UniProtKB/Swiss-Prot annotation:
<dbReference type="InterPro" id="IPR036944">
    <property type="entry name" value="PPIase_FKBP_N_sf"/>
</dbReference>
<keyword id="KW-0732">Signal</keyword>
<dbReference type="Pfam" id="PF00254">
    <property type="entry name" value="FKBP_C"/>
</dbReference>
<comment type="similarity">
    <text>Belongs to the FKBP-type PPIase family.</text>
</comment>
<keyword id="KW-0697">Rotamase</keyword>
<dbReference type="Pfam" id="PF01346">
    <property type="entry name" value="FKBP_N"/>
</dbReference>
<keyword id="KW-0843">Virulence</keyword>
<dbReference type="InterPro" id="IPR046357">
    <property type="entry name" value="PPIase_dom_sf"/>
</dbReference>
<feature type="signal peptide">
    <location>
        <begin position="1"/>
        <end position="20"/>
    </location>
</feature>
<dbReference type="GO" id="GO:0006457">
    <property type="term" value="P:protein folding"/>
</dbReference>
<dbReference type="GO" id="GO:0003755">
    <property type="term" value="F:peptidyl-prolyl cis-trans isomerase activity"/>
</dbReference>
<protein>
    <recommendedName>
        <fullName>Outer membrane protein MIP</fullName>
        <ecNumber>5.2.1.8</ecNumber>
    </recommendedName>
</protein>
<dbReference type="InterPro" id="IPR000774">
    <property type="entry name" value="PPIase_FKBP_N"/>
</dbReference>
<dbReference type="InterPro" id="IPR008104">
    <property type="entry name" value="INFPOTNTIATR"/>
</dbReference>
<comment type="function">
    <text>Essential virulence factor associated with macrophage infectivity. Exhibits PPIase activity.</text>
</comment>
<feature type="domain" description="PPIase FKBP-type">
    <location>
        <begin position="144"/>
        <end position="233"/>
    </location>
</feature>
<keyword id="KW-0998">Cell outer membrane</keyword>
Amino acid sequence: MKMKLVTAAVMGLAMSTAMAATDATSLATDKDKLSYSIGADLGKNFKNQGIDVNPEAMAKGMQDAMSGAQLALTEQQMKDVLNKFQKDLMAKRTAEFNKKADENKVKGEAFLTENKNKPGVVVLPSGLQYKVINAGNGVKPGKSDTVTVEYTGRLIDGTVFDSTEKTGKPATFQVSQVIPGWTEALQLMPAGSTWEIYVPSGLAYGPRSVGGPIGPNETLIFKIHLISVKKSS
C-alpha cells in the first residue's frame, strides 16, 4: 500500500466522520450525500481489511488541518506513525497469506491422497490425476497445437471459479499457454473426450494467488470436454 494512498484513505474517512458527527441525519445536498457515501465506502473497506482506527481522532485531525489550527502531532511524528502502520499492515498481510498457503497445501495433499484411490482415477508420475468420463477417438493435441474446449473449474470444496458456461461459448487456446496440469492432460486426451482432472498446486498456480477464489497453493479440479484440435502448421 502506497503511503499517499494510506494517508488519503485516512483523511477521506476522517472528513466523512467529521461531517456525520456535525449532523448525522442531514444529507440534504449532493455534497452531503457524496461525503457520506465516500465515508461509508472507506469504512467498509477499513472493516474488511481489519484496519482499526479511532474515527473521533481522525475527525479531529481533519478539522485541525482544515481550520489551520496547531496540529497535535508534528509532521515527523505523523510520518513515523504512518510508516509503522504500513509496515505492520504488510507484515500482517504476509503472515495471513503464508498461513493460507500452508493450509491450502495441506488440504490439497490430503484431497489428492484420498482421491487417487477412487474408482477410475489415474495418477501420473507428475502427480496429476485424471478420470475419463467419456472417451473420444479423435486426434491428440501436441504442445504447439490449438484446442477448443468446454470446461468448468472448481476448488476442492466445490466452489466454481471459472466455466465456459458463464460465457456461453467454448474457449480456444494453444496447449502450451495454460497451466502445466492442463498442458499435460490435454496431450493425453483424444478429441471428443471428457475428462475430470485433479491438478496439484505445483501444476496449477503454485504459491501465488491469482485473485478471486483461487488462493495460494490451491489444488484445482477441472471437467474438460475437448471439442476439437487444430494442428500447428
